[in-house]
Amino acid sequence: MKKPVLLMILDGWGIAPADKTNAAAMAKTPNLDSYFANYPHTTLEASGKAVGLPAGQIGNSEVGHLNIGAGRIIYQSLTRIDKAIEDGDLYKNKELSRVMDETKQAGKALHLLGLLSDGGVHSHIEHLLALICMAKVKGLTKVYVHAFLDGRDVGPKTALEYIHELEDGMAQIGVGKIATVSGRYYAMDRDKRWERVERAYKALVLGEGGKAASAAAGVEASYAAGVTDEFVEPFTVDGVDGKITAGDGVIFFNFRPDRAREITRALHDEDFPYFARPEGARPVNYVCMTQYDATITAPVAFPPEEIKDTLGEVLAQHGLHQLRIAETEKYAHVTFFFNGGVEAPNANEERILIPSPKVATYDLQPEMSAEEVTQALLAELDKDKFDAIILNFANPDMVGHTGVLSAAITAMEKVDDCAGRIVRKVLSLGGSVCITADHGNLEKMAESDGSPNTAHTTNPVPFILVSEEQHKLHNGILADIAPTLLQLLNIKQPAAMTGKTLID
């Protein structure tokens, strides 16, 4: 009979002192409490440099699952680009150099578009300023910025700070003008709401939309109308003819793919059925900062790095059977991200997707689909089929994001109940359960002023090893989880995995 090793990821559960904002501590969790009391446990760093992000940067589910599945620190796009700027490699970047050189030779304009903030989730203003610097060094004189306003990864009314920082930077560097401004709601849609994308596109290509004397004046007018950064309607800046036309150079400096795809397709793709585009707007010399989609043919400045010997691959190499199971909200995380950004399953890797409930916000159903996930998993455990199981419970994170404390407490209590039933079953089979998380969230549901906190945290996450054998554990990082699981399965850790087992 197989003795399964199960990794249970309680998404969004960080460790923090018990207080009236810590939903995890306020919840009644008899099962988790008993594991902390009776089994070895430690904490893991899940943010900043420990997961390949800049120091102090909050972790997220994509980054967390990449690091867990890879068994090594995966340097995220933000860190890669930061490093390239620091080392001077950005200025030698093949695609960025090429597009700037060709644009200059053709006497055309260079357009830099992307999210204008230092949120570090989709983009960073420092990357934009570095590109403007590079354009100056390359001798380009027609450089236009198309600023997408944030208000989501940063405060809802912070755009003026970033506009002033950009304008000061351009003045110092000696090149660049803001040509258009649009809230990310329009320019960075990801839900195929093409009517939104079309409005941003028309500002970029036709100069249509609102008009303002300056970028700041347009934002101030929006504020006066009660419209915050994310929702600012696309407008052009008077006196700046920065329309994107055929033959121009275009660099989209966002590094996160999901919200960069639609506007990229509109500006770049030859076939585009979603709305009418004018003649003379294509082809442009387009460069994506990172790979937004394998089917987008535009050149990429920072192509993906291949991650070899992920946990899933190593299990497959040893002929082991593995199961990945989660509800919709976290299914991509236990499959695509856990496998190092690879869509196809490994040999003997089975997947179960449980639909997430169709509710407007998850505080309305904090249990989400945890019960259905649990029942499906218990049924699989009866089959004596799997050596390793990767399970994600979405509740702590998705309900944590709502900022509703009572709902987050309910979410945690439901997950505790499910965890108890799963652990009992695995122990009855002689297996082991590692309980952990990918980042913090629901342990901080409010700010010090009492306003809701809906964001992730930089808190460490727990790691509990529930098994018949008593082990000693030490502190670590998310990348140390895969080597630990391999040790429990008596499999040699591959050299590519630089994480270290948590077992002393």
Predicted feature descriptions by range:
Residues M1-D504:
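Feature captures the catalytic ectodomains and active-site-proximal regions of enzymes
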